[in-house]
Amino acid sequence: SKQFLQHIRQYNSAFQMTSFGCSEDRIPGWQPTFRVKGQIHHRIGSLLNEGNERPVYCQIYFIEDAQEQVRQRNSYFDNLNADVISDVQAVLHKQNRYVSAFKTAAEILSEQNTDDMNLILSATKRPHGTHERRFNIPCTSELGVLMPNDIFNNRDIILRTRSHGRPLQRINECHRAYDALQYPILFPTGSDGWSIDLKLLNPKTGDHSNKQMSAMQYYTFKLMHRDYFNPLLYSGRLLQQYVVDQFVKMETTRLLYLRLNQSSLRCESYDVLCDTLKNNASSNTVGRNIILPASFTGSPRWYHNKLQDSLAYIRKFGSPDLFITTTMNPQDPVVKNCIYTGQRPEDRPDIVCRVFQRHVQEMKKLMVNHSIFGKLSAWLYSIEYQKRGLPHAHWLLWLSRNDRIHPDSVDNIVCAEIPAKEKDAVLYELVTTCMIHGPCGKQFPNAPCMKDGKCSKGFPKPFCNDTTITDGYPTYKRRSP
């Protein structure tokens, strides 16, 4: 239903078995995307709540009365439908293998009347066969085991009967239950997610290879459109959270690899040398840092290399002639054709990014191969993401000597005027729908660009008969009507 999709993140939170810890990045006004700052971590507590504490997360599944479970879940959110909660709860109790494991554990604990038992969800116990594409769901006995002693793998999930003041346990990103415990709405049967034990398959024979399947390979597969129903692609805001969660997981595994392989990356001697030179310290007091190589996207050395590449162009060809920004249009016909009925572009970040990448390649072909701005001596571009989620690209172009733009020809190339509809109806439609800032101003005080009662971008711009440039910022030709 529309109400379910509108509040799908809240419905998932009502049934999730682990907590979702993050610092969400919010902006004033309308925010169609889910953004976080820093790390994401999933945590899980004890099987039973302490004393008079309210049951949370997996503890709610141990409540015997089904209606009391519904009441507890509904009490955390004001905008959920109790009938929908009851229906989803019934499905999970019937189909979800983790819920079945919890119910079995509750029966055993009730019979033995002890607080010394732990429910171990193994990280290394693998289901028979293959994964979700071919895997058979293992039975509950293969999923978890009640153990009285603390004998477990360091990646196992240990659910103690009661916490007795112990802190919440953080779920390892490589655990096969990482996704199923957090997203029961997306994985109602409790199917396994990615783990380091997964191997790639030979597409011709279907046999397992010796190569490990990376998190990126696994989640790329999960996000692709298939001939069968994929609940991920219909989950709207929950898909955004899922994609962000998995990207952070991929980055975490990459950082872990770099931390564990510093010696093979020849970082130790570099680290010690830098510490000694900067701090003028003795060898006994020098600490050890983790070196992120230039191959890690977003690291200081990666940025430094990109900057040096750009400066090399400037040293060779001088200042760039054109600075162009291309922004993704959420109303792009290709995007509308690819998304499902009832969806908005922000519901499918995968489609938006793929379409934008195609447009970037087409733009590159027009500028480099077809020389629409003139013959280029050099060019580069950078892709960024706006706060509201849409990607955009910044281009720097160096024109050849014969195609350089002179000051007296600028107004023939660019201006800030609305074209006449009678002369070019297509251009008029593009400019009026995609190239006009706002609305903002005193009548729209909650607009994202409004700061201290005025537009932070300087709109509306003053009328100008000719383009002028002050301190590197142009005021484009915009004649008074």
Residue ranges and their predicted role:
Residues S1-P481:
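Non-catalytic interaction regions
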